[in-house]
Structure formats: C-alpha cells, structure tokens
Curated annotation (Swiss-Prot):
This is 3'-5' exoribonuclease YhaM. Shows a 3'-5' exoribonuclease activity. CDD domains: HDc (cd00077), YhaM_OBF_like (cd04492). The keyword Transmembrane helix does not apply. Residues 163-279 form the HD domain.
Length: 314
C-alpha cells in the first residue's frame, strides 16, 4: 500500500492516487487562471496548485474526483504543499474508489453509537432523556457518518460522533470530580451541541456548507430542533430552555459564534470540554505526522503555531 500523502517529507517525489477534496479557482498575478486543489487520502490532505488552468479543468478536477498525481513535496508558509508535475483523472478500469481515500474515526461506528446510547440510558431526568433520545434517533444515521467540521478539527468520516464520544468521556470525568454538576444536562449538551451540523454540512465526502448551514448555522438549527422535539413530546418545562441555552452558548463568546455567553454552570463546562477536545484533536493529528525532534506544520486554528514533538516521545 502506498505511503499516505501526509507521511512524505519535504523533497520527496510522490506518484500516487489522491481524492480531490475541494477545488477553487483563482487568478494569478500574470492574469492567468489557476486551481487550488485540496488533495486527500486517509493520512490527511495537502494543497496543490494547477497553473494555467483551462475552463475544462474546472470540470475535470472538481470535488470527489480521484486523480493520479506525480509531484514533489515542498514547504510553503509553514505548511507542506504538493508541486504538481503531472495530474490526470483516474480511469474507470483503475482499481480505486472514493472510500479508499477517506480518513475515518479510529473507533468503529457501532461502538460509538453504543456509547452514546449508554450515556442517554444513564440519564435520570425524563425530560432531558426523552428530548436527547428523540433527536439522536431522528438524526442517527447522519450523526454517525458526518464529520464535525469542514476543517480544523474532527473533519473526517464519523468525526462528529467521535468528537461527541470523547467529550462524553471527558464530561463523565469532570462530573465525577465535581458532583455538583448536573450530569444529565451536561451529557445532553455534549450529545446535542453539534448535532445541527447534520443540516449545516453537506455530508462526509468533500464536505461543504449547505444553504441552511450558511444562512442559519448549526447553533440556530439545533435550538429550533430542540423546540420541535419538546412540542412533539409534549414537554413544557424549564429543561427545554436550559438545553437551548447550552446550545446557544457552547462557543463561549459572540466573536466565536455564540449569541449568548454561558450563564448556567453546565453551559460553562460544556464550552471548556468542547474547546479542549477540539484542540487536542488538532494537536494530535499535527504531531502524528512528524518525527521526534521535529515541529509540526502551523496549525491555523491554534494561533497559527507550530508544535514540537520532544525527542523522548519515541
């Protein structure tokens, strides 16, 4: 099996199949069009430029196209980039399929869904439990398949479920240490906080924002979904309002996308847990691509910092 694109070092030549994750047209300083291609396999993704792009190239090299590329790994502005020597679409007779290039969560789907189901089962507040179970059942298929984002963290197949399960385990540890926390509320907030992304995002392959995602966003979407669930289940209680508040405030600040700051204890903890798991995922994925004694590529969402892998971390 060919070495993953993110495992190649600067200066190495590559000759392998990759999947086009996204394709964006630009105009160079000489006035000629080019395409910025994000190419991916199971190890991650890398940017490449297709210079002097023709109009037909925009169709030929669109998202979800498998291509055979030959090129060299370069380092540019803190990140590796693939300098193309040759690129062509893969033929129908070439034994490659899209699934071969998709990064997936490290835990099987059924195990993640079992874990979420168990946390819901442990809830003692019937109103919180019923709303959470209702929404997970309603969007279960998408929940287990979708990424958690288009970029930055958990942006892979089943990334949303993996993010939630990791956060649930964190929430359990925090609640064990601080028993004054309402476990049911915290667990429900974790499970539901990003569930609106199943409407905000297009799906697990070549993920983009939907019209609803661009115009409303996952926070507004889920606040509405909670209200609908409560109405369908004939639940008229304060739990509905507090669950909606947890969703509205989980980004922490207006400049980070939350209309309201956390004003309930469990909302504050949800924000911390979400932030911690996202950042650890970003660091882990960057660090696993470098050797001990090396620095990672710059991680834009972490203040554009590089991270060092200590030599003793063999």
């Amino acid at each position: 099996m060919a070495k993953g694109i993110m495992l190649h070092e600067v200066g190495e030549q590559v000759d392998l199949y990759l999947l086009i994750k996204s394709s964006t047209k630009g105009i160079a300083s000489n006035g000629k069009p080019f395409l910025t291609l994000m190419l991916q396999d199971q190890s991650g993704d890398i940017e490449a430029k297709l210079w002097d792009a023709k109009q037909q190239d925009e169709v030929t090299y669109g998202p979800q196209t498998i291509v055979k590329v030959v090129g060299d790994i370069h380092h540019y502005r803190g990140r590796n980039q693939l300098k193309l020597r040759n690129i062509r679409p893969a033929g129908e007779n070439e034994n490659v399929k899209i699934d071969d290039f998709l990064e997936t969560a490290p835990i099987p789907k059924n195990e993640m869904m079992d874990a979420v189901t168990q946390y819901i089962f442990e809830m003692k507040n019937p109103n919180i439990q019923r709303i959470t179970r209702h929404l997970v059942k309603k969007y279960g298929k998408e929940f287990i398949d979708y990424p958690a984002a288009t970029k930055n963290h958990h942006e892979f197949v089943s990334g949303l479920a993996y993010h939630v399960v990791s956060m649930l385990n964190l929430a359990k540890s925090v609640a064990d240490l601080y028993p004054s926390l309402d476990r049911d509320l915290l667990y429900a907030g974790v499970i539901l906080h990003d569930l609106g992304k199943v409407k905000e995002l297009s799906g697990p392959v070549s993920t983009t924002y939907t019209v609803e995602g661009n115009l409303l966003g996952h926070i507004s979407i889920m606040v509405t979904e909670i209200a609908k669930a409560a109405e369908e289940l004939q639940i008229d209680s304060e739990e509905v309002l507090i669950l909606q508040h947890l969703i509205l405030s989980h980004h922490g600040k207006p400049e980070w996308g939350s209309p309201k700051p956390p004003m309930v204890k469990e909302a504050e903890i949800l924000h911390y847990i979400d932030n911690l798991d996202a950042k650890i995922n970003m660091m882990d994925r960057a660090l696993e691509r470098v050797k001990p004694g090396e620095y990672t590529e710059r991680v834009f969402a972490l203040d554009n910092r590089s991270f060092y892998k200590p030599v003793f971390h063999k």
